[in-house]
C-alpha cells in the first residue's frame, strides 16, 4: 500500500497542471491500483479545506468530491464509516468537514463528546460547547 499526500489527491480534480494530473491518472489506472492507496484522515481533511479556501468550491461540490473519493475502490480509507457520516453532516451542517470527521473518529474511539468553542460545530450531537 502507498500513502497519498493531499496535493496528489487534489490533482484528481484540479487539472491546471496537466503533467501532474496525468501522472495521478496513470497511477490510479494501473492494474493493481484497487485498494493500493491510503487516504488518511488528515489528507481528507486537508483536501476539503483546500477546496474550500484555495479553490473557493461550494459546500455541495466539496461534499460530492469527498463522496467520490470515499467510494473509489483504489483507496483504503481508515474510519470509512466515520468519513461517510461526516460528509453527510457537512453537506447539511455549518461546521467544516474536518470538525465533523474528528468528532466522529473521537466517538468511534469511545468519546461521549468532543469539546469545542466552535458554535457551528456544536449544532449537532457530536460536540459540546466548552464555556469560557
Regions found by a protein language model. Name each.
Residues 1, 103-132:
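Acidic, PIN/NYN-like endoribonuclease modules and their adjacent C-terminal/linker elements
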Residues 1-39, 54-60, 67, 131:
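Short, well-structured N-terminal submotif of metal-dependent ribonuclease cores
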Residues 5, 40, 95-96, 118-119, ...:
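Histidine- and aromatic-rich ligand-binding microenvironments
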Residues 9, 44, 121-122:
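A generic structural signal for short hydrophobic patches within well-formed alpha-helices
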Residues 13, 28, 70, 84-87, ...:
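Regular secondary-structure segments
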Residues 40-43, 82:
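Short, conserved alpha-helical segments within structured domains
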Residues 48-52, 87:
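Amphipathic alpha-helical segments within well-ordered protein domains
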Residues 74-113:
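Active-site neighborhoods of divalent-metal-dependent phosphate/nucleic-acid chemistry enzymes
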Amino acid at each position: 500500500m502507498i500513502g497519498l499526500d493531499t496535493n496528489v489527491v487534489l490533482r484528481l480534480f484540479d487539472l491546471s497542471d496537466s503533467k501532474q494530473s496525468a501522472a495521478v491518472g496513470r497511477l490510479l489506472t494501473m492494474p493493481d491500483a484497487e485498494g493500493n492507496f491510503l487516504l488518511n484522515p488528515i489528507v481528507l481533511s486537508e483536501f476539503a479545506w483546500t477546496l474550500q479556501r484555495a479553490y473557493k468550491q461550494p459546500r455541495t461540490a466539496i461534499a460530492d468530491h469527498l463522496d467520490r473519493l470515499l467510494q473509489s475502490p483504489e483507496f483504503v480509507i481508515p474510519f470509512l464509516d466515520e468519513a461517510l457520516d461526516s460528509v453527510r453532516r457537512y453537506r447539511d451542517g455549518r461546521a467544516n468537514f474536518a470538525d465533523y470527521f474528528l468528532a466522529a473518529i473521537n466517538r468511534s474511539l469511545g468519546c461521549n463528546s468532543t469539546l469545542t468553542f466552535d458554535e457551528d460545530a456544536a449544532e449537532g450531537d457530536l460536540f459540546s460547547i466548552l464555556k469560557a
